[in-house]
Amino acid sequence: FDMAEHVTGLRVTSLCADLQTFHPTRKQPKHSVETFANKLLGPEDYIETPVDTEDFGAVVFRMGKRTRGAMTASQVSAGRKNGLSIEIYGTKCSVAWNQERPDELWAGHRDAGNQIFVKDPSLLKPAARTFADLPGGHSEGYDDTFKQVFRRFYSSISTPNGVPEYPQFVDGLRQLKILDAVLQSHRTRTWIGVPAFETGK
């Protein structure tokens, strides 16, 4: 939800959620495994462990009076590892971005051919250029977002009166309130309002 709110500038106002546990057991490594160690584990390295957490969620939501959204979160989609994507549909144009192809932005038009924009800092507007450190043809992705957040955090220390360009604790609190509404909606099978309050963005 945070990405949808950040990209659109709108706020989720209400939602309806459906959560599901498709796999009641999960494979748990018998021994600790380092993250990103690329160690291949065989069937003998796991034990089946019962779980009661959801592995799939579907949420429809409203952002104000006219904007609607739909979101799925899944750990059961074969072949999808860390997929994250967003699509925004307007009256004249649509845009789509996919984390697995971070340097591309797709734009769809009603009255012209579709386009794929490839990141090239020399062609970006100044406000966007500050987020691109590498020249065109050099991919920047998920791990680069942390660098950008830390850069903006440290910059705010030297200019304390500026507007923070990174998530604040209140932004995290807002996302927790949205997730509370997701759980409440799932339990009650009803639309749930999301409390409105200002965040750091």
Region spans (language model):
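Glycine-rich Rossmann NAD(P)(H)-binding loop
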Residues: T72-V76, Y89-K92, P195
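C-terminal capping/lid region of NAD(P)-dependent oxidoreductase domains
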Residues: Q184-K201
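C-terminal glycine/acidic-rich active-site capping loop/insertion
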Residues: H6, Q20-K65, E87, K92-Y166, ...
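Glycine-rich phosphate/pyrophosphate-binding beta-alpha loops
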Residues: T72-K81, G141
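Conserved S-adenosyl-L-methionine
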Residues: V12-Q20
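Active-site-adjacent "lid/gating" segments in soluble enzymes
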Residues: F1-T13
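C-terminal hydrophobic helical "lid"/dimerization subdomain
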Residues: G172-Q184
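Beta-strand scaffold of nucleotide-dependent catalytic cores
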Residues: C16, A70-A73, W97-N98
